[in-house]
Swiss-Prot record:
It comes from Scolopendra dehaani. Pfam families: SVWC. One of its GO terms (molecular function) is toxin activity. The lineage of its organism: Eukaryota, Metazoa, Ecdysozoa, Arthropoda, Myriapoda. This is U-scoloptoxin(16)-Ssd1a. It comes from the Eukaryota.
Length: 109
């Protein structure tokens, strides 16, 4: 499969996921460390193996190390956009892990 065909399929799949789940999915190209061609490096010097998932520190999202067309990527899964209705306020969730942190607290007058 060509790279452009892979990207089109990914966009279609991601679009379907966003429409039905109200979440978000993104991809970040990763440059592997020398001698570790099948591992995604993270900020603190550790690496994630292909298929390994972890919570992104300080954010309400998780990342998974994936490989497509001989390139490494982080697949980032997050909450998407939430809105409170008229007369309501939205507050960040107190949960610390994804996806539980995606559910905001809503208070209405």
């Amino acid at each position: 499969m060509t790279t452009s065909a892979t990207v089109i399929i990914m966009v279609l799949c991601v679009g379907s996921l966003v429409i039905f789940s109200e979440g978000s999915i993104g991809f970040e190209l990763v440059t592997p460390l020398p001698g570790k061609p099948d591992e995604c490096p993270v900020e603190d010097g550790r690496t994630l193996a292909i298929g390994q998932t972890e919570q992104v520190p300080g954010q309400c999202e998780e990342r998974t190390c994936i490989k497509m067309d001989d390139q490494l990527y982080f697949e980032l899964a997050g909450c998407g956009i939430s809105e409170a209705g008229p007369g309501c306020e939205m507050f960040e969730s107190k949960a610390e892990t994804y996806p539980e942190c995606c559910t905001p607290e809503i208070k209405c007058n």
